[in-house]
């Protein structure tokens, strides 16, 4: 967050040429890539990182930072603490990698974590487990409207007394990289 905020105040743009793969032959060559993300450095253990797609790791990292910054941890009853974290599409990179394994190497090579890693609701579920948030847990999936929809639903849940606090947001995972 400090790096991001510092870049904002210095007028540094976060969008640049794609560096994660060769864009030759692609019309789109620009993206807002997250640089140097290390799940362990933000508190996600290695085993968890191996079982979660990058979009869910981004969600967990953001939730951990938001909860730490808010000072709310331990101050809300677990049954009144919710998680509304959506995803426009889920773990696209995992989907691409595991589909390629299936087609090129056969079904026995597909990870048993394929579905749990890629489905969009896993980010919300993992965050709820991590913070013992036993209140409402809603993974909103409404394409490009997911961010606004998620925040609106979280607001509504608090307004109508379904929860006292809700972690709300939407992670954006990396683009699906072609297999080299």
Language-model features, listed with the residues they occupy:
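Short loop-beta-helix segment that forms the pyridoxal 5′-phosphate
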Residues: 136-142
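Substrate-binding strand-loop-helix patch
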Residues: 175-179
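Conserved "HGTGT" condensation-loop signature of ketosynthase/thiolase-family condensing enzymes
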Residues: 1-89, 94-135, 156-159, 169-170, ...
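Active-site histidine-anchored catalytic micro-motif
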Residues: 150
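Short conserved active-site loop signatures built around small residues
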Residues: 147
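Short, high-confidence coil segments that cap the C-terminus of an alpha-helix
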Residues: 162-166
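Structured core elements
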Residues: 139, 167-168
